[in-house]
Structure formats: structure tokens, C-alpha cells
From Swiss-Prot:
CDD domains: OMP_decarboxylase_like
Family the UniProt entry places it in: Belongs to the OMP decarboxylase family. Type 1 subfamily.
EC numbers: 4.1.1.23
Protein name per the record: Orotidine 5'-phosphate decarboxylase
Organism from which the protein derives: Helicobacter pylori (strain Shi470)
Keyword tRNA processing in annotation: no
Binding site for substrate: 8, 30, 59-68, 118, 178, 187, 207-208
Function: Catalyzes the decarboxylation of orotidine 5'-monophosphate (OMP) to uridine 5'-monophosphate (UMP).
Subunit: Homodimer.
Any Pfam family: OMPdecase
Amino acid sequence: MQLCVALDLEKKEDNLSLLQELKGLDLWAKVGLRSFIRDGAVFLDEIRKIDGNFKIFLDLKLYDIPYTMANAALECAKLEVDMLTVHLSSAKSALTILMQRLNALKKRPLIMGVSALTSFSEEEFLSVYNAPLKTQAIKLSVMGKESGIDGVVCSVFESLAIKEALGKDFLTLTPGIRLNKNDKEDQERVANAKEAKQNLSDFIVVGRPIYQAKEPREVVLELLKDC
């Protein structure tokens, strides 16, 4: 299991300062919408300058009509990121075209499809998709695998079921990881790193428990022990 550190701080300088503290550790730097829109592609180069071994996870959750998505994913791949997210709800046709475009490259990022955001409660998900959360997450994951993507973004609570349905080689990335499960904030379906590993998660995403800590490096070292 691998650790992705979410770079969601208010200022670019704060994100870079955090990475300076974590230099030399085996982790992924997750760049989301806030940081990428504010700081641009140059931010990715600044991450690499701090530690060239950091892998970069560009979490943009692309969601649009097929060719627009595919073209956007191609531009992201040109930035030499190691992982990229797309929405599974964009449908099989969009994902298939996207993967055809990326598979023509010599090197491409891992493509992870978002099934159900961890901010969804069961009730909220049902009101939007008119289906039980876990059932729909598995259904979307099956479609994603048929489209050729590498894995899905899901909560810890769907990870094992997805692995059982689609095999251990189909990757699961689980956000909503907390040191204390009572600290939900804007997440609904949270778990800790040990539970993520028990449920066969390949990647975990941790943000606030790291960057709000007095000693972020110590928190990361503890998390890496559980990975």
C-alpha cells in the first residue's frame, strides 16, 4: 500500500514547505483542483525539484464529453504526472476513447476512476444515483475495468468488494483516511490506514491529519509503517 499526501494548503509556499519536511520519504504528492488552478503546471516542476523521487498524482477528476476528456487527459500526460483521476460517471465510451489516446503514448499515467466521493453519505448517494452506494460503486468499477482504466477511487468500505469482483490487479485508491475516525470534517466514509490495508487498498490519501500536525514528518512515518 502506498501513501499519497494531499497538498491542499492555502498557499503554494505552505505546500512546498510541507514537502521539504517530507523529503526523502517514499510517497506520492497529490495535487488537486485548488493547487493546480492556483499554481499551474510549474508547481509540478517545483515538487520535482524538492525530491525527484516523489511521484505526482494529479487529482483533477476529469468529467466531460468523450473527446474533451481525452484531449485533457493527453495534456495531463504531457506533464509527466504518474497518476490522474477521471469520473467513472462520464461513461464507458468516454473512458474507452481516453484510454485509446493514452495507450498510444510511450509512457502514460495510471488512470483512476472516481466511483463515489467519500463525502457522500448512503442517503445522499441514493438520492443522486437511485442505487445503493456499494452496488453502484462495483457496477461503475466493472465498467471502468472494461474501458481499460487501471483502478478506481473509492472508500475503504468498497475496496474489498471491488477487489473480490474484479481481481487484486485492479487498483483501489482510498481517500478519507484519518488517524482518529471521529475526525470526519467534510468526509462521511472514513477509516484508518490499518483498515485500508485490511481491505486491500493499493493507495491511501491523507491530507489534514498530516499538514495540521505539529510534526508532519512523524505522522507520515507512522502512516508508512501501516502501509
